[in-house]
Curated annotation (Swiss-Prot):
GO CC, alphabetical: cytosol
Cross-referenced Pfam families: ProQ, ProQ_C
Gene Ontology molecular-function annotations: RNA strand annealing activity; RNA strand-exchange activity
Region called Disordered, residue ranges: 105-182
PANTHER family: RNA CHAPERONE PROQ (PTHR38106:SF1)
UniProt name for this protein: RNA chaperone ProQ
Disulfide bonds: none
Similarity comment: Belongs to the ProQ family.
Keywords linked to the UniProt accession: Chaperone, Cytoplasm, RNA-binding
SMART domains with a match to the protein in the record: ProQ
UniProt feature, compositional bias: Basic residues: 137-146
GO-annotated biological processes: post-transcriptional regulation of gene expression
Gene name of the encoded protein: proQ
Amino acid sequence: MENQPKLNSSKEVIAFLAERFPHCFSAEGEARPLKIGIFQDLVDRVAGEMNLSKTQLRSALRLYTSSWRYLYGVKPGATRVDLDGNPCGELDEQHVEHARKQLEEAKARVQAQRAEQQAKKREAAAAAGEKEDAPRRERKPRPTTPRRKEGAERKPRSQKPVEKAPKTVKAPREEQHTPVSDISALTVGQALKVKAGQNAMDATVLEITKDGVRVQLNSGMSLIVRAEHLVF
């Protein structure tokens, strides 16, 4: 009997589960809330397949249920599903609130990491600028010109060319954006931009919710944004 290939990471296990149970797991896009106690169902159904251990299944489930796309799917009115996609009851308010807090904390951690990275880049740029200014070349002494002998004719001084004033370079015009005043006028699939500080990132409308607009960035990340951060 040939040895079955072994899955080495939680992402590989999730991809296997999405292929094995397509009505329950998904490899991309919004995920459906899972049935409570689905871990034991997985152990019973995939025991021995792909040399999977309980530890690997538990780690993969933890990664899957803590992902942003899964937390987005845990919302009021959503229904839990079993391995075959059969409904297993609606989510209760406590689980929805817990998922919302997890999502907010995850977003806050990402923003803090980005701010820290930007601060380090600014510090590195400032340090590099100081190093460039520090070593200055020593000025060499000007060579002494011999004195003109008495009676020798003076050579006419050459006129220096008139230096032209440097042309002023116009600063590039800032790109003007129109703020979104009414999110109800937006449509799914519509292209717009998300303001992030002084920059605006391209995005596509995925869903209009009571808390704002869920958009997907070009990087593939999706998030809910309030109207004041959206522009055309």
